[in-house]
């Protein structure tokens, strides 16, 4: 059990005394004492140990135990059962075992005796790790009202959101996911485990686990271990491991309901959960089952005044345009804007700031989500030394997102390689065009831009179904050795339906119409025979329902991920040293990951306006063997109260020719010169093989918010970038037609990602060095300081859109370079596409310092009731950078100090509890940042004294949670509530055009909800 979980149990515990009478048996034996009520656990221990326990009922009533499953001596088992109760085992002068109260029991020592899956190791009796472990237990998750594990974990410094409901509205494949990233190194470098086991990826575009598919109701605690973990768990554990440890010993029935709302309206939520468990067949069989359903309602842009502020920032000139409207209007804009339609009819001289279309009104800030989860578990004791077990987790997550209606123009391209364009309308044959527009058009035809609102807003429906299951056998051998054999199967099926998109081939046919014998018809005979309906785009509401039905395309995309694993290991003591037993583990793992996708034929042929998602299939297989060892070198020696060395090695063989065989390893040391101080260090080599999408996927569309480096460029703007922008004839023509300045019309750009079959593994060398201090003179206090350095060579990544744009246009030799080959502009110079292909870049490096401290105390001497705990978690980023080969030299992308990668982050907490109440105040701090480091460099180069929206102040968010239990010693009923973001701080104002902002003027790092409330009730019976 982590220190956080232990402290919670301490706060809920009471003083008690227990006397053990009789003779304790000296030899080790097998124990299986269930978690739950302490009295029941002590009775079970008494039966299994063959000893008599004497205790006062009132002293143990309401206390709980974590349970023990082990082959151990009774004294050790009893000590484990009492972990977290402020009781410890002592032998009196007569030789009998006794239980005495220790007011200042060290947190981690109490935590170290729990029989759990130890994150970061498979060794039996190794509880202190050489790398930092931060945990969040069930009580904290419950009382803070979190329904999403990712949202809860991002309160921990160093844990960042990767994808969330607040930042994936425009994403093609990630919409509605909920993933995290350790050290900002990416969700695919954070290995997520469930009870120490790998689990199938349920993200559409990378190897990542969406935490929304794991029901928080069934989670006992979550442990986050930083540092390379590939030697223990295999590929992907580059930045660290998130181990989600599920409920193991639910006795009886537990039910919960939680409701949430926001102070400014919208974004409500509700959760219903129920679970039941019990023992049968003379306690040989344990069964548990449960289900949870939660709904996150939509938070629309219209629910927040800030989201509707229509502002466009132009970074090239450090100016603001307001209102920030789209030139793709609902009535159509024709002949380069010389004519347009509004509600009153045909008008001359379109001005975007006056006549444009406001896209924000249909926007979504929080994607609505329905989440149904189920879980079943069983354990069956086949013999006294062998147990069969199994568990399955099912998740069905649906999300629905709404976006503004699709736009179409004469330069809109379609086809697999964008080889076709919709094209101009005939100025002589089109039967709907008025005389004014026909007369103004050139001989090449009528150019146009039109938002097709009559078809309806874009609707994106995602359904993600995930099944995870494991079955296994485990048992004990002679000489205190244990073994475990597990088979796991996981399957993810995702389907996306994109409604109200356009069939661009049909749009082309329908626009190419004529009047014959007084009847308007499509000119293409084959299209006409297939039911072509001529399309009238001239005017607001000019598209009839029949026209809309003909060009509408509701498309689908389906993906299936499957994972099968077989793993086994044995663990136990190799031999004894004077300081203790040398513990070891030996094991194997065989894994197969398979991905296949199926795409709507209209998407495959490229005629649908929805993002292009290709069909592909790929399989990765890996066979691995591993070993771990921990050796206590010294104990109770001068300047060596404890000295332990540990190490691990894993050899993996892949079916990928570019990867082959990899070797991961780690070596660590823990040294306590005195009992109060523990120094820990570990050096590890970790690998991550490319996943199926990174290897096999053809280019697949995605939509990113991209600020064009050419936006705002004028004839006099200095610098190489501006010079290269003006050299593009399309941009120059657009400048001439727009008053001498080039303006980006939309920052929503297609940014397709492509795999690369030549990728090979990335390799990380990680160092952690730190210390833990628990002074005996200050009971209840603990502090730790850790330094980390992660260096990833041959890092698998694609360059950012900003890096590709800058690499293209900052070349003094012009735009004939590899970066410009990834960039596509339309006939008017507008940025429409940037291709991102995965490649092995030079290096990514992350360095920093983590500080943690907690102090548990009471103020009884001042007659203040209750117990207190103060805590601090602080993270200081020293470096986060990526190197890649530029035009003529190695370029470096620095990220520290920008939005999302602040130099300083911290979380402060103060808890108070008594026999009935628990109150928790927490504060999250994000240090001052800049919108982007590229913008800061530009501002310095331009000499701007006051660059807009660049320098952003510190951010604080304060939360409070309160819970009430009528009888804490028998906590069958609990009422709890939270207020998050008490002071309703939305963070910095970041409009469209800033690198980290968007058209709704926020960044999800700071949240988009504002003040939020939850109220819940939990009962057990």
Model-derived segments and their meaning:
Residues 97-102, 149-152, 178-181, 210-212, ...:
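N-terminal periplasmic accessory domains that precede
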Residues 645, 782-935:
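Gram-negative outer-membrane beta-barrel transporters
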Residues 42-44, 48, 94, 100-142, ...:
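Short, acidic, small-residue-rich periplasmic hinge/interaction motif at the N-terminus
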Residues 791-793, 878-881, 923-937, 964-1021:
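C-terminal beta-signal and adjacent terminal beta-strands/loops
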Residues 97-100, 125, 154-198:
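Extracytoplasmic beta-strand/coil segments of soluble accessory domains associated
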Residues 197-226:
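Short acidic/polar hinge/loop motifs at secondary-structure boundaries
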Residues 299, 305-312, 339-369, 375, ...:
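Surface-exposed, low-complexity loop segments enriched in small/polar and acidic residues
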Residues 249-253, 265, 281-284, 383-386, ...:
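Short loop/turn motifs that connect adjacent beta-strands in outer-membrane beta-barrel proteins
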């Amino acid at each position: 059990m982590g220190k956080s979980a232990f402290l919670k149990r301490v706060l809920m515990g009471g003083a008690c005394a227990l006397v053990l009478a009789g003779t304790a048996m000296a030899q080790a034996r097998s124990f299986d004492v269930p978690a739950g009520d302490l009295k029941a656990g002590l009775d079970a221990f008494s039966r299994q140990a063959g000893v008599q326990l004497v205790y006062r009922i009132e002293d143990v009533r309401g206390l709980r135990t974590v349970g023990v499953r082990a082959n151990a001596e009774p004294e050790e088992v009893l000590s484990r059962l009492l972990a977290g109760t402020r009781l410890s085992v002592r032998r009196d002068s007569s030789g009998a075992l006794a239980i005495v109260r220790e007011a200042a029991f060290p947190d981690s020592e109490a935590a170290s005796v729990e029989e759990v899956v130890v994150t970061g190791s498979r060794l039996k009796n190794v509880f202190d790790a050489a790398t930092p472990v931060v945990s969040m237990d069930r009580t904290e998750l419950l009382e803070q009202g979190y329904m999403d594990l990712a949202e809860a974990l991002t309160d921990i410094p160093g844990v960042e959101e990767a994808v969330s409901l607040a930042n994936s509205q425009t994403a093609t494949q990630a919409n509605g996911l909920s993933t995290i990233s350790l050290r900002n190194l990416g969700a695919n470098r954070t290995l997520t485990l469930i009870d120490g086991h790998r689990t199938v990826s349920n993200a559409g575009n990378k190897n990542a686990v969406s935490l929304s598919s794991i029901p928080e109701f069934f989670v006992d605690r979550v442990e986050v271990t930083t540092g390379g973990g590939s030697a223990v768990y295999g590929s992907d554990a580059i930045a660290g491991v998130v181990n989600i440890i599920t409920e193991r010993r639910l006795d009886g029935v537990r039910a919960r309901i939680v409701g949430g709302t926001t102070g400014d309206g919208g974004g409500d939520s509700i959760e219903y959960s129920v679970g039941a468990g019990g023992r049968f067949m003379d306690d040989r069989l344990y069964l548990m089952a449960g289900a949870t359903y939660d709904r996150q309602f939509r938070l629309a842009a219209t629910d927040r005044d800030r989201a509707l502020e229509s502002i466009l920032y132009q970074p090239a000139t450090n100016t603001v345009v307001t209102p920030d409207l789209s030139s793709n209007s609902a009535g159509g804009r024709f002949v380069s804007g010389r004519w347009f339609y509004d509600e009153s009819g045909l008008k001359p001289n379109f001005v975007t700031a006056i006549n444009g279309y406001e896209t924000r009104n249909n926007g979504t800030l929080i994607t609505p989500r329905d989440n149904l989860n189920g879980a079943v578990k069983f354990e069956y004791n086949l013999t006294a030394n062998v147990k069969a077990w199994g568990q399955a987790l099912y998740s069905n997550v649906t999300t629905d997102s709404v976006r503004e209606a699709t736009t179409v123009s004469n330069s809109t391209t379609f086809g697999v390689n964008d080889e076709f364009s919709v094209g101009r309308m005939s100025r002589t044959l089109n039967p709907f065009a008025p005389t004014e527009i026909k007369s103004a058009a050139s001989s090449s035809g009528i150019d146009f831009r039109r938002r097709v609102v009559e078809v309806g807003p874009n609707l994106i429906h995602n359904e993600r179904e995930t099944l995870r299951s494991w079955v296994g056998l485990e048992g004990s051998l002679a000489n205190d050795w244990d073994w475990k054999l597990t088979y796991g199967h996981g399957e993810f099926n995702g389907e996306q339906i994109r409604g109200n998109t356009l069939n661009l081939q049909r749009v082309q046919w329908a626009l190419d119409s004529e009047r014959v014998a007084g009847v308007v018809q499509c000119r293409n005979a084959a299209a006409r025979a297939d039911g072509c309906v001529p399309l009238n785009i001239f005017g607001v509401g000019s598209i009839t329902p029949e026209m809309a039905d003909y060009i509408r395309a509701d498309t689908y995309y389906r993906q299936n991920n499957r994972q099968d694993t077989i793993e086994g290991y044995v663990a136990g003591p190799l031999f004894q040293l004077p300081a203790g037993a040398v513990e070891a583990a030996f094991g194997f793992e065989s894994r197969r990951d398979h991905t296949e996708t199926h795409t709507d034929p209209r998407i495959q042929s490229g005629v649908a306006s929805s993002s292009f998602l290709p069909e592909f299939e790929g399989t990765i297989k890996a066979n691995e063997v591993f070993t771990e060892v921990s050796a206590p070198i010294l104990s109770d020696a001068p300047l060596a109260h404890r000295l332990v060395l540990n190490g691990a090695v894993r050899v993996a063989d892949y079916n990928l020719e570019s990867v082959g065989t990899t070797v991961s390893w780690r070596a660590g040391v823990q040294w306590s010169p005195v009992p109060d101080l523990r120094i820990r260090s570990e050096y590890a080599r970790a690998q991550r093989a490319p996943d199926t999408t990174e290897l096999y996927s053809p280019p697949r569309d995605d939509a990113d918010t991209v600020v064009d480096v050419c936006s705002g460029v004028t004839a006099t703007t200095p610098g190489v970038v501006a010079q290269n922008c003006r050299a593009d004839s399309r941009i120059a023509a657009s400048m001439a037609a727009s008053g001498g300045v080039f303006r980006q019309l939309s920052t929503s750009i297609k940014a397709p990602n492509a795999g690369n079959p030549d990728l090979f593994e990335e390799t990380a060398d990680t160092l952690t060095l730190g210390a833990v201090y628990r002074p005996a003179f200050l009971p209840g206090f603990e502090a730790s300081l850790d330094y980390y350095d992660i260096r990833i060579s041959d890092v698998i990544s694609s360059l950012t859109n900003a890096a590709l744009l800058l690499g293209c246009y900052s070349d003094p030799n012009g735009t004939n370079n590899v970066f410009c080959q990834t960039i596509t502009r339309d006939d008017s110079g507008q940025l429409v596409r940037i291709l991102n292909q995965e490649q092995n870049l030079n290096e990514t490096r992350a360095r920093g310092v983590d500080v943690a401290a907690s102090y548990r105390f009471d103020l009884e001497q001042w007659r203040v009731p209750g117990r207190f705990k103060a805590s601090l978690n602080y993270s200081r980023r020293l470096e986060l950078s990526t190197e890649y080969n530029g035009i003529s030299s190695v370029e470096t992308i620095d990220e520290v100090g920008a939005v999302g990668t602040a130099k300083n982050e911290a979380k402060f907490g103060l808890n108070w509890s008594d026999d009935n109440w628990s109150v928790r105040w927490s504060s999250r701090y994000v240090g001052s940042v800049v919108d982007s480091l590229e913008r800061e460099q530009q501002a310095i180069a331009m000499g701007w004294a006051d660059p807009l929206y660049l320098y952003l102040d510190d951010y604080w968010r304060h939360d409070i949670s309160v819970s009430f239990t009528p009888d804490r010693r028998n906590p069958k009923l609990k009422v709890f509530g939270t207020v998050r973001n008490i002071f309703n701080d939305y963070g910095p104002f970041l409009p469209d055009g800033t690198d980290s902002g968007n058209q709704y003027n926020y960044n999800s790092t700071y949240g988009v909800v504002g003040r939020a409330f939850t109220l819940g009730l939990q009962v057990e019976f």
